[in-house]
Amino acid sequence: MERKVMILSAGVGSGHNSAAAALQRNLANRPDVSTVTTLDILTTTPEFYRTVYDDGYFEMVAKAPWLVGWGYDQADAPFQLGSRVPWWDQINTTETVTRIKEFSPDIVLATHFLPARIVANLQSAQELFTRMAIITTDYDVQGLWITNTFSRIFLAREESRQYLIASGFPEDRLTASGIPVRYEFGQQVDRPAVLAQFGLRDGVPILLISAGAAGGPYALRIVQQMQARTEPFQAVVVCGHNADLKRDMDTLVGDDTDRFHVLGFTTAMPDLMRVASIFVGKPGGLSSSEAMAAGLPMALINPIPGQEVRNSDYLLEQGAAVRNNYETTIGWKLGELLADPARLERMRAAAQATGRPGAASTVVNDMLGDRDGQLWISDKAQRSLREASHLDKPDRPASPKQRLRTLIDTSSGRSVALITDGQLKELSKVMWASGTGMTLERARLREITTLQLDPTLVTMLRNVLAHRPDLKVSIT
């Protein structure tokens, strides 16, 4: 059966769209896929909204990074901000909704939390019938990514999966796949050809400095400090689309072109990352995953509070990176690494062990091979999940009514709903139940006025039964 796949992203930075592109490329020429389309939803929104959402975020990163970290922490627990799309986002994404409905996808792959929440809201209102996968793009999972319904969540690492399982999510709906990156990062590279293309010498360590992401002043300081180092090295400085930075960098480097090679935007990052010795840059989810897939150690600079700090924690824990906390010592720290080839080799081995170059294939194969529907989470179960994940309430047992219960389709063995024990007892009074099993009947749900059930529970169960008259479930 050929299916239509829609990949939804949001161009806040480049990482979410890069993950989307990796997925689209993996889906190309699949015989079981009829059509693939990728939509950056911000391109369908009003210019003012797009500016606030994208530029406003990076303005906050530059001028009030503490506020970014505070906001991350406030939304860290699942469902901390609820599962509904805020009115501000709703009124600015009407064209997005229209585009999604018109395409009518069989499968949605969401690489940003906003389109995931939009799709979940459409599914809850029975305005869209599809299977949605959420593909997270940082090493830790943040609560904003979790919706009240999904088919599967793909996570960057096993600890994030274990965190959600410990919070109460069914483990059959969670996959530690890694973050999707272009397949080239995991392939062998023609090293002599790449070195010749960029005028690099074999046998001399190569620093790959992501200057555009680091920001102009910081990147210039890195190069200034490296100009004073005496260790053998050569550096490729990538300025991206920042023409002013490239001009300033060219001026700073001057005639020292044997050691410093200044580039603007380049599509050759997969090649450069596979021949480099150290990547110098920020620990974004995608850039970090690309470096790990290429087996490239990282020297981390200026992480954004929240997700980038969490990413750097993980990379340090894996032994694949060092982090620089002082702008004035980055040259010294890089010199220490260059002077210790054995340490660099250990870091390279750690990066290779951490990398997941096949993440895109895992996502695509799992979603195309899985024919089961969505998991639905009741409003009361969402509150229980939120409380279970709070770090400031350690080991506080849930009240009997708040304990989570999973409804499992007996024919497929897959979880279909997450409710509370109190809701299960209500349901048992009106549905046929026996031991640890129950039969959910759509006809009975039509009798809501006489059933006296929680209306939100009835609405959720109607979604569970949207395409079948009844469903036999076991309960755990």
Residue ranges and their predicted role:
Residues A22-R99:
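Conserved N-terminal ligand/cofactor-binding loop architecture of enzyme catalytic domains
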